[in-house]
Swiss-Prot record:
Active site, UniProt feature: E137
Organism: Xanthomonas axonopodis pv. citri (strain 306)
E.C. no: 3.5.1.88
GO molecular function terms attached to this record: metal ion binding; peptide deformylase activity
PANTHER family: PEPTIDE DEFORMYLASE
Descriptive protein name: Peptide deformylase 2
GO terms, biological process: co-translational protein modification; translation
UniProt remark on cofactor binding: Binds 1 Fe(2+) ion.
Superkingdom of the source species: Bacteria
Primary enzyme class: hydrolase
Keyword Protease: no
Cofactor: Fe(2+)
CDD domains per UniProt: Pep_deformylase
C-alpha cells in the first residue's frame, strides 16, 4: 500500500469540485487499490476520514473509519445526503488543515445514499460523530473546508498559523 500525499490548506486544488465516479469503475482493481491506499494514508495520518479530493483525486468518494480499533472501514462513492435532522456543534479538525480545530455546526443526524466498495447502492442513517464525519468529508468533495465556516478573520489566522508551521518544518 502506498502512502498518498495529503493536500494542505490553502492549496487551491482543495477547492476543486469532484466529479461523480462511474459505477463500473468502483470494482476495478485500480479503484480498489486507490481505496486501500487512502485507508492506509488515513490510518497513518492518523485520521477518521479522508476524501479523494484531499489526495488530489477529484472524484466523489471518501473513506471513513470512526472506530477506536480502526476495524470498521467504510467507503462512500457518490454520496448524497437525502435528509438532515437537528443540529450539533462539534469541534472539528482536518488532515488538510493540520493542528487546527474549531467548532462547526452540522446536522445531528443524516440519511445518506451512496455506492459501497462493491458498487452496490446503500442508504445509511447516521448520527453523532459518523454524521459529522460524513458531512465534513462531503464538503471536501464540493471544494469546501471546515475553515470556511469560520469568520474571515479566524480563517486568515489559520492560514498564517499553517504558513508559520510549514516554515518551521522546512
Amino acid at each position: 500500500m502506498a502512502l498518498l500525499p495529503i493536500l494542505e490548506f490553502p492549496d487551491p486544488r482543495l477547492r476543486t469540485k469532484a466529479v461523480p465516479v462511474d459505477a463500473a469503475e468502483v470494482t476495478s482493481q485500480a479503484f480498489q487499490t486507490l481505496l486501500d491506499d487512502m485507508f492506509h494514508t488515513m490510518y497513518e495520518a492518523p485520521g477518521i476520514g479522508l476524501a479523494a479530493s484531499q489526495v488530489d483525486v477529484h472524484k466523489r468518494f471518501m473513506v471513513i473509519d470512526i472506530s477506536d480499533e480502526k476495524n470498521l472501514p467504510q467507503v462512500f462513492v457518490n454520496p448524497e445526503i437525502v435528509s438532515k435532522q437537528g443540529e450539533q456543534l462539534y469541534q472539528e479538525g482536518c488532515l488538510s488543515v493540520p493542528g487546527i480545530y474549531a467548532d462547526v455546526s452540522r446536522a445531528d443526524a443524516i440519511t445518506v445514499r451512496y455506492l459501497d466498495r462493491q458498487g452496490q447502492p446503500q442508504e445509511l442513517h447516521a448520527d453523532g460523530l459518523l454524521a459529522v464525519c460524513i458531512q465534513h468529508e462531503m464538503d471536501h468533495l464540493d471544494g469546501k473546508l471546515f475553515v470556511d465556516y469560520l469568520s474571515p478573520l479566524k480563517r486568515e489566522m489559520v492560514r498564517k498559523k499553517l504558513a508559520k508551521q510549514r516554515k518551521h518544518v522546512a
